[in-house]
């Protein structure tokens, strides 16, 4: 068997199947970084703060999108 056939990725049949275990959420993803990012939805922390207006966000990509509006 070729290594690429066992590779865990978008085209593999052996993908990870990660499901959020928070309450009854059940969001599923195949990438660890996606589930890690998703878990921030359930936590009240907002560590990413806008330097222009002070608005805070849970995820860096949300702050980045917000800053484009300034």
From Swiss-Prot:
Give the Gene Ontology MF terms in alphabetical order: DNA binding; zinc ion binding
Q: Which GO terms describe its biological process?
A: positive regulation of transcription by RNA polymerase II
Q: What is its main location?
A: nucleus
UniProt keywords (A-Z) are: Activator, DNA-binding, Metal-binding, Nucleus, Repeat, Repressor, Transcription, Transcription regulation, Zinc, Zinc-finger
Q: Where are the zinc fingers (C2H2-type)?
A: 18-42, 48-70
Q: Which InterPro entries match?
A: pacC/RIM101, Znf_C2H2_sf, Znf_C2H2_type
The record's GO CC annotations read:
nucleus
Protein's UniProt keywords contain DNA-binding: yes
Q: Where in the cell is it found?
A: Nucleus
Q: Which residue spans traverse the membrane?
A: none
Q: What does this protein do?
A: Transcription factor that mediates regulation of both acid- and alkaline-expressed genes in response to ambient pH. At alkaline ambient pH, activates transcription of alkaline-expressed genes (including pacC itself) and represses transcription of acid-expressed genes.
The record's family statement is: Belongs to the pacC/RIM101 family.
Report what the protein is called. pH-response transcription factor pacC/RIM101
What's the source species for this entry? Penicillium echinulatum (Mold)
Upper lineage is: Eukaryota, Fungi, Dikarya, Ascomycota, Pezizomycotina
């Amino acid at each position: 068997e070729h290594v690429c056939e066992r590779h865990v990725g978008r085209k593999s049949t052996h993908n990870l199947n990660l499901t959020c275990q928070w309450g009854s959420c059940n969001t599923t993803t195949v990438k660890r970084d996606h589930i890690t990012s998703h878990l921030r939805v359930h936590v009240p922390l907002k560590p990413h703060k806008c330097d222009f207006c002070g608005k805070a966000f849970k995820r860096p990509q949300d702050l980045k999108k917000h800053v484009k509006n300034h």
